[in-house]
């Protein structure tokens, strides 16, 4: 499997100004100012210890991300120059441990790896992590939704769609879009 997540992240970084900010076009023509932050990489030892603690082999694309950045914030919303959060918060290994203790409805087969603006968590299915290329789920409050994606495809599409909930797009036809918005 060719892993391209580093290329996607480098492309995004090239679009950012010196403050890590940029303007993006949101749905229905909304112009938003956003900020991105990328944290220092995790070491091979930290990743291996994490895998041993959870008794899991992490997917290759997610391991590559961790070796590049042990966490990131993508498309945090800026209002009048102040970061008000939102966007995609890719958790560090430490934040994953903490989240596993605090997410009330988290099933033991899942590892939370990111948090989204609308209260959703992006999850790796431990039972599929080393055997199935489509191992990603979304936990939305109390409902689990299989995304039929891996980590790097999710991040790539999230960046290309400029932070939109792209996984819901196939649900909208012109007819039902205007009824719900």
Could you tell me what each predicted segment is?
Residues 131:
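A short alpha->loop->secondary-structure connector
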Residues 154, 179-181:
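Non-cytosolic coordination micro-motifs
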Residues 121-128:
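Low-complexity, glycine/alanine/valine/leucine- and proline-rich hydrophobic stretches
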Residues 1-121, 179:
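A surface-exposed partner-binding patch
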Residues 127, 135-170:
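A recognition module on extended beta-rich or small alphabeta surfaces enriched in W/G with H and D/E
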């Amino acid at each position: 499997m060719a892993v391209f997540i580093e290329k996607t992240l480098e492309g995004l970084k090239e679009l950012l100004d010196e403050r890590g900010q940029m303007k993006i076009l949101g749905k229905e023509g909304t112009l938003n100012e956003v900020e991105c932050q990328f944290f220092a990489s995790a070491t091979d030892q930290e990743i291996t210890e994490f895998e041993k603690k959870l008794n899991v082999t992490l997917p290759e694309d997610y391991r590559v991300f961790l070796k590049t950045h042990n966490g990131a914030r993508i498309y945090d919303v800026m209002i009048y120059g102040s970061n008000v959060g939102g966007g995609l918060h890719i958790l560090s290994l430490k934040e994953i441990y903490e989240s596993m203790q605090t997410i009330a409805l988290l099933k033991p087969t899942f590892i939370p790896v990111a948090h989204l603006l609308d209260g959703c968590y992006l999850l790796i299915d431990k039972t599929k992590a080393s055997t199935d290329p489509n191992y990603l789920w979304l936990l939305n409050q109390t409902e689990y939704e299989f995304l039929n994606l891996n980590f790097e495809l999710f991040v790539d599409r999230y960046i290309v769609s400029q932070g939109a909930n792209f996984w819901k797009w196939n649900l909208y036809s012109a007819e039902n879009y205007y009824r719900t918005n």
